């Protein structure tokens, strides 16, 4: 599967949820401890800035007060920059302080976007069906190692037990500390 296509699918799903957020919902809590809906939108928009800055060899700037439009514009700009020849092979610094390729950064951003799309929908009372192909990719690429590293750094909550016959999205969300 093409990482840029997967990135677009993940960001398109997030944009749909973000556009349905009402202004009065921005201060609501989310499943992400200590983050409001606005904080979560800022974080997600920041992920687009991270990719663009990493491609340019620069550190990203902190963002606040961002909107669905900011996220959409940032995702479009990141996707365009990712199409440059050799972009996915460039090396950058991860948010956790280790070097990885832009291609790995894109995959990590997809995972982050998929999980946070669910967080945002849950916080604002929206129903969302996560893209099954993206969920399966996240499971194959990131479980179980990535959540464990995230827990060690305090970025991911404790595993939430799910039934043995749970759907793929529920298994992924449980591994990432979400109660479904």
Regions found by a protein language model. Name each.
Residues 1-13, 20-33, 46-67, 73-180:
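Structured surface interface patches that mediate subunit assembly and partner/cofactor docking
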Residues 40:
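Extended, alpha-helix-rich binding/interface surfaces that flank or overlap catalytic cores
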């Amino acid at each position: 599967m093409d990482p840029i296509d997967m990135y677009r699918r993940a960001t398109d799903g997030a944009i749909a949820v973000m556009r349905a957020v009402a202004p009065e919902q921005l201060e609501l809590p989310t499943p992400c401890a200590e983050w409001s809906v606005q904080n979560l939108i800022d974080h997600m928009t920041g992920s687009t800035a991270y990719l663009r800055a990493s491609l340019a060899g620069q550190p990203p700037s902190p963002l606040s007060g961002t909107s669905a439009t900011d996220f959409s514009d940032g995702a479009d700009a990141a996707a365009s920059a990712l199409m440059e020849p050799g972009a996915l092979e460039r090396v950058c610094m991860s948010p956790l302080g280790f070097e990885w390729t832009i291609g790995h950064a894109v995959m990590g951003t997809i995972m982050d976007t998929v999980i946070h799309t669910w967080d945002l929908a849950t916080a604002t009372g929206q129903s969302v069906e996560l893209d099954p192909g993206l969920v399966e990719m996240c499971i194959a690429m990131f479980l179980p190692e990535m959540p464990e590293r995230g827990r060690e750094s305090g970025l991911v909550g404790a595993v939430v037990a799910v039934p043995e016959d749970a759907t793929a999205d529920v298994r992924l969300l449980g591994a990432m500390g979400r109660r479904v």
